[in-house]
Amino acid sequence: ILSNKKEGDKIDVLGPLGNGFTLPRTTNSEPRAIIIAGGIGAAPLVYLAEELTKKKIKTIVLIGAKTKNLILCEKDFKKATPEVYVSTDDGTYGSQGFVSKLFHKILKTTESKFETIVYVCGPHGMLKCIADICQERKFECQVSLEEKMACGIGVCLGCVVKTRSGNKLACKDGPVFNASELIWP
């Protein structure tokens, strides 16, 4: 068990598993990326923000959490891009309400001339809501699913995800999927 390990002990690690986010292709239009992080879903998105910024892609980050003390990675995101916005359900920090409400607000106040790609990780309800908004606006939306991955190699079938092309495994085929490919519960 990991808690019994001491500094210098050796451990076996399996990973990373599955696939990650796909960065925008170079196109004639100037792409922009909107990263939306809900709760602990912020952690896997920091590196993405850094990579997008390195590629000179305009990047906006939206972070949502229940309360101020549950906001994660804000400083890390701000190192990658100056455009970081926060919302809390209870209004203790940033905008009050769900991050999806903040997403609507940002879309109304930012230029729409950009090809927009949305990257999102967080609770399932938030993912579905953001995916619906993206579908309405015809934005590409990539979601990182927070599924329980017991074995991590596709044997246990504990992370089955329903898609338009049949069942897939979050550990092998994901955890990142195009939102339009998923069948939401």
Segments and roles (model prediction):
Residues 44-53:
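Histidine-anchored nucleotide/phosphate-binding helix
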Residues 33-42:
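Short, glycine-rich nucleotide/cofactor-binding loops
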Residues 10, 32, 57-61, 83, ...:
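Residues at the starts of beta-strands that form the adenosine-phosphate
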Residues 14, 36-37, 62-64, 121, ...:
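Short beta-strand segments
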Residues 23-33, 54-56, 105-117:
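Intrinsic disorder/low-complexity segments
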Residues 1-34:
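FAD-binding FR-type
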